[in-house]
UniProtKB/Swiss-Prot annotation:
It comes from Coxiella burnetii (strain RSA 493 / Nine Mile phase I). Homodimer. Involved in the gluconeogenesis. Catalyzes stereospecifically the conversion of dihydroxyacetone phosphate (DHAP) to D-glyceraldehyde-3-phosphate (G3P). Pathway: Carbohydrate biosynthesis; gluconeogenesis; Carbohydrate degradation; glycolysis; D-glyceraldehyde 3-phosphate from glycerone phosphate: step 1/1. This is Triosephosphate isomerase. The active site is at H96 (electrophile), E169 (proton acceptor). Gene3D superfamilies: Aldolase class I. Keywords: Cytoplasm, Gluconeogenesis, Glycolysis, Isomerase.
Length: 255
């Protein structure tokens, strides 16, 4: 099964109305050269409408950086999947390491957010990854498999999981300038693919696996050569249109 590669740009808590407008204009101008790879941007919540209005007639998708596990109610500061659907979000990032570490999100909460997104027809990008301490203790595979296992257990309707994306983001490589080598990343991606295959062969073949960890134009091409890497979750480089588009072009050429 041919999986369409995806390059997702997580803007985190960056941007202003003006800078977002400039970035969107540059991305719209440059994305026409991409024939195979899909680009998606993930702005802060307050810029979702701006992205929707700018990108609705382009080939660029958009989504949110988080979603509530709850449908509605007295949850101050939360944003529901139904609200994201109102802005035609195609994707939502769940379980990012910054949410897990700084906000104490558990595997069970991440799985509940996945379920909430799927119920509203939004494709979750499920982040998994290990700390440097866990890597040094040779716990990488056990950690990421447990993170994904909880999602699969709490969302056991396999048909509903079609369209989900899994992003491996080694925590020790995020915002540090470090990055996993292509072979290190491929080892984890192959393990994730095998775990999915044990659950369901069709699910394993259709699920896109992204690498996220200081992805830049100078290391992206080598990552995309790996058989189980279907794209990237890009942080800082996604805030610069030229860099983000170059990563997209490298992804486009590799598939």
């Amino acid at each position: 099964m041919q999986r369409r590669p995806l390059v997702a740009g997580n803007w985190k808590m960056h941007g202003s109305r003006e800078s977002v407008g400039q970035l969107l204009r540059a991305l719209k101008h440059g994305c026409e050269r991409l024939e195979t790879a899909e680009l998606a941007v993930f702005p802060p919540f307050v810029f979702l409408q701006q992205c929707e209005e700018a990108l609705m007639r382009t080939q660029i998708s958009w989504g949110a950086q988080d979603v509530s596990e709850f449908e509605r109610g007295a949850y101050t500061g939360e944003v529901s999947a139904a609200m994201l659907r109102d802005f035609h979000c195609r994707y939502v990032i769940v379980g990012h390491s910054e949410r897990r570490q700084r906000h104490g999100e558990t595997n069970e909460q991440v799985a509940a957010k996945v379920r909430a997104a799927l119920r509203c027809g939004i494709r979750p990008i499920i982040c998994v990854g290990e700390t440097e301490k866990q890597r040094n203790a040779n716990q990488t595979l056990s950690v990421i498999k447990e993170q994904l296992a909880v999602v699969l257990q709490m969302n056991d309707n396999l048909a509903s999981l079609e369209g989900m994306v899994v992003a491996y983001e080694p925590i020790w490589a995020i915002g540090t300038g470090k990055n996993a080598t292509p072979s290190q990343a491929e080892e984890v991606h192959a393990a994730l693919r095998d775990q999915l295959h044990r659950q369901d062969a069709t699910l394993a073949e259709s699920t896109r696996l992204l690498y996220g960890g200081s992805v830049k134009p100078d290391n992206a091409a080598a990552l995309f050569e790996m058989p189980n890497i279907d794209g990237a979750l890009v942080g800082g480089a996604s805030l610069e249109a030229e860099q983000f588009l170059k990563i997209g072009q490298q992804c486009n050429q590799s598939f």
